Amino acid sequence: MKKNQFLKESDVTAESVFFMKRRQVLKALGISAAALSLPHAAHADLLSWFKGNDRPPAPAGKALEFSKPAAWQNNLPLTPADKVSGYNNFYEFGLDKADPAANAGSLKTDPWTLKISGEVAKPLTLDHDDLTRRFPLEERIYRMRCVEAWSMVVPWIGFPLHKLLALAEPTSNAKYVAFETIYAPEQMPGQQDRFIGGGLKYPYVEGLRLDEAMHPLTLMTVGVYGKALPPQNGAPVRLIVPWKYGFKGIKSIVSIKLTRERPPTTWNLAAPDEYGFYANVNPHVDHPRWSQATERFIGSGGILDVQRQPTLLFNGYADQVASLYRGLDLRENF
């Protein structure tokens, strides 16, 4: 596996920027929740920036045992841990970037059940402990690119999705993989109230082609910065597909179903002209309301330190994944 060396070490987000409270968020540009009604829920260039010297330490999540394969320990710069978990899109807990960190503590992640079903020979059910013990865990430093034209670099911990799917033995009828987030409106205020949850239809659903799901880069993620995922980052298990926009990274997964037909996906249902099924990072295909040619990398500095950088095709992973889309019109199949 080739390394992706497209960022300097000085650009990595520092761990001290990762876990932030609402009172520590400084908004350079603001927008009210009412203004975020669909289909305008994603707004480019509206970034919140974290400021202050009294930031709390990272949450005391469970320390994980994991390896650091050389192939994934590249020289990409890391986004600070407090920014990774303090600046999130997780509409089940509110629309503001700080809402998930403020509100996701209500999510109960243990016990947990993840079911693998559909076009498989051996359906599986995993519990909370299986997620961190059934498969060897490894740390992977990946770029993360939001459709809103900002980006991070994050040291995720998890296991390749293909290892889980192989245990279930997909049948010859399996062509797609459908994912579903937990539906728990008593714990997730955005599922209870359309205003809080951005008007989306819940539970949140996502999907991949089977070959995308089986790709070695596709990661079932259970940790970050050496510890179990905090709730605002999608505990206890989420999906990371580093060559796609962040909304493909479904959080708090309870169901994986292999299907014959392409499954529905939440943002494509909400605004099909703006959010495609594939959602591959592509600087040549703009969002209808903003350019995707460049992005703002979130590092350890404040708003005056933010640098724009060119967006890379497939988020810098073209050598690994471009062959998946040979012959496919990426403008039409965005």
From Swiss-Prot:
UniProt key word Zinc: no
Listed InterPro entries: MsrP, OxRdtase_Mopterin-bd_dom, OxRdtase_Mopterin-bd_sf, TAT_signal
Keywords of this entry: Metal-binding, Molybdenum, Oxidoreductase, Periplasm, Signal
Taxonomy, superkingdom: Bacteria
One function term, GO molecular function aspect: oxidoreductase activity, acting on a sulfur group of donors, quinone or similar compound as acceptor
Catalytic activity as recorded in UniProt: L-methionyl-[protein] + a quinone + H2O = L-methionyl-(S)-S-oxide-[protein] + a quinol; L-methionyl-[protein] + a quinone + H2O = L-methionyl-(R)-S-oxide-[protein] + a quinol
Binding site for Mo-molybdopterin: N88, Y91, E92, C146, T181, N233, R238, G249, I250, K251
PROSITE patterns noted in UniProt: TAT
Subcellular localization, as worded in the UniProt entry: Periplasm
Cofactor note: Binds 1 Mo-molybdopterin (Mo-MPT) cofactor per subunit.
UniProt PTM comment: Predicted to be exported by the Tat system. The position of the signal peptide cleavage has not been experimentally proven.
GO cellular component terms attached to this protein's record: periplasmic space
Annotated GO biological process: protein repair
EC number: 1.8.5.-
Cofactor: Mo-molybdopterin
EC class name: oxidoreductase
Stretch forming the signal peptide: 1-44
Role: Part of the MsrPQ system that repairs oxidized periplasmic proteins containing methionine sulfoxide residues (Met-O), using respiratory chain electrons. Thus protects these proteins from oxidative-stress damage caused by reactive species of oxygen and chlorine generated by the host defense mechanisms. MsrPQ is essential for the maintenance of envelope integrity under bleach stress, rescuing a wide series of structurally unrelated periplasmic proteins from methionine oxidation, including the primary periplasmic chaperone SurA and the lipoprotein Pal.
Subunit structure as annotated in this protein's UniProt entry: Heterodimer of a catalytic subunit (MsrP) and a heme-binding subunit (MsrQ).
Recorded family membership: Belongs to the MsrP family.
Protein name per the record: Protein-methionine-sulfoxide reductase catalytic subunit MsrP
Species name: Escherichia coli O157:H7
